[in-house]
Regions:
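Short N-terminal strand-loop motif that marks the start
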Residues: 1-87, 151, 155, 159, ...
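C-terminal hydrophobic helical "lid"/dimerization subdomain
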Residues: 2-17, 277, 281-285, 326-402
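Glycine-rich beta-strand-centered segment in the early N-terminal region that forms part
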Residues: 38-52, 67-121, 126, 168-170
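Mid-domain Rossmann-like dinucleotide-binding core that forms the NAD(H)/NADP(H) cofactor-binding site
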Residues: 162-164, 168-252, 256
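Rossmann-fold dehydrogenase core element
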Residues: 292-294, 305-344
């Protein structure tokens, strides 16, 4: 395959003419197709995607569109490839790029801000004021892999150098896909929440962000760390990741338990990852005066909040989206130092051609799936084993709402 003259490649990592990629058609419909391999421009690299984890937001995009925004509108029937929690190997360097080398393993952040708006200048590029306003011109405005540009359910993707995080060979592919998840928790706990060692933290909801929130909080010296949820097996994973106390809210009142654990003083910080309708009110009552609540979940029902209680007790309430202020780099540092084992939340692995099954496992929590990872490392085997006209590979696949 010929490449633009200023794109640096390496014979040790040859590029084929096309790649396999899942593209979104109508809502809930994905097709595995051949697409041209994109070429990196200035300040960009081409990454061969080795593994991609499935996030609940991917499921929302596939079925409902938002928060993806392609060409100024919904992402359906635009040959758009979703997926945003991925890692891989650098396969090509755009003009002038010398920060990375071909063959280097990297984890990839989602967001590359415009770099010009107020929020980007503050380092809050996940809150870029130009999000989605590039309308297909990736040289302008905010770029978000799997949201406003093609993402990771493919063999290759182009990424801005500011979104790359170098990872050591000691970190597995699956673990590297979790850097962004841990970075999201890190962003909420430290950059926005100001968590310092010795402060007490509760995490509500043992999903991926919640479980890694426990791990990050403990690694940063929080004490005590309390995890609440409804599934005992997930609570035990949380304990293994550093929770000092776990509370099953089906059998115990979480607020009363926290008050008992803290001798009535309350905690300093709550990371709310459950999305339950009463979670914010419960979080407020777990805190001492001046405590902070970080909202990291998307409730599917209206939420009732006792604002007067929050005002009287000087409680701070804020939301996070993604992994701003380079928090993912700090999360990767903790993971590289083996301060916690993020792979405890990795439960299932599928091949790229099995993406619809992987999505179903993630959506329906089959076999208590927590983090489902899709790998491209067996793609060549799949190509050899499946005829080119096999509809399971090239045809439309309806991703059922289950």
């Amino acid at each position: 395959m010929s490449h633009p003259a200023k794109v640096e490649t390496d014979a040790a990592y040859p590029l084929p003419g096309h790649m396999r990629a899942w593209v979104l058609g109508d809502p809930g419909q994905l097709s595995l197709v051949d697409k041209p391999i994109p070429m990196p421009g200035r300040a960009e690299v081409l990454v061969h995607i080795d593994a991609v984890a499935i996030c609940a937001t991917d499921l929302e995009i596939i079925h409902h569109g938002a928060p993806a925004l392609i060409g100024g509108g919904e992402p359906f029937n635009k040959m758009f490839t979703p997926g945003h929690e991925y890692m891989g190997t650098v396969a090509g360097l755009g003009p002038g790029v010398d920060e990375y080398r071909v063959g280097q393993r990297v984890s990839v952040e989602v967001h590359a801000g415009c770099g010009q708006c107020k929020r980007c200048r503050e380092g809050m590029y996940t809150a870029c004021l130009n999000y989605g306003l590039n309308y297909g011109d990736v040289d302008k405005g905010h770029r978000a892999n799997g949201f406003t540009t093609d993402g990771g359910f493919a063999e290759y993707a182009v990424n801005n150098i500011n979104t790359l995080i170098a990872i050591p060979d000691s970190m597995s592919d699956a673990e590297a896909t979790l850097v962004v998840t841990a970075g999201t928790a890190m962003y909420g706990l430290t950059e926005l929440g100001g968590l310092v060692a010795g402060e007490g933290v509760a995490v509500l909801g043992p999903g991926p962000i919640g479980l890694l929130g426990v791990a990050v909080a403990k690694a940063l010296g929080a004490s005590p760390v309390v995890l609440t949820g409804t599934r005992d097996n997930r609570l035990q994973i949380g304990r293994a990741l550093g929770a000092d106390h776990v509370i099953n809210v089906r059998s115990e009142d979480a607020v009363e338990a926290v008050r008992r654990i803290t001798a009535g003083k309350g905690l300093d910080y709550v990371l709310e990852c459950s999305g339950a309708p009463d979670a914010v009110d419960q979080a407020a009552r777990m805190l001492n005066r001046g405590g902070r609540i970080c909202l990291a979940a998307f409730p599917h029902q209206p939420v009732s909040i006792d604002v007067a209680y929050i005002v009287r007790n000087n409680i701070y309430l804020y939301g996070i989206r993604g992994e701003g202020k380079s928090a993912a780099h700090r999360a990767e540092a903790l993971m590289s130092q083996k301060r916690f084992d993020a792979t405890k939340i990795h439960t299932h692995t599928f091949g790229l051609h099995e993406l619809p099954t992987a999505l179903r496992y993630a959506r329906e929590h089959i076999d208590d799936a927590i983090k489902v990872v899709v790998t491209t490392r067996n793609t060549e085997l799949a190509r050899a084993a499946v005829p080119a006209d096999d509809k399971s590979m090239h045809g439309n696949t309806k991703v059922s709402d289950g």
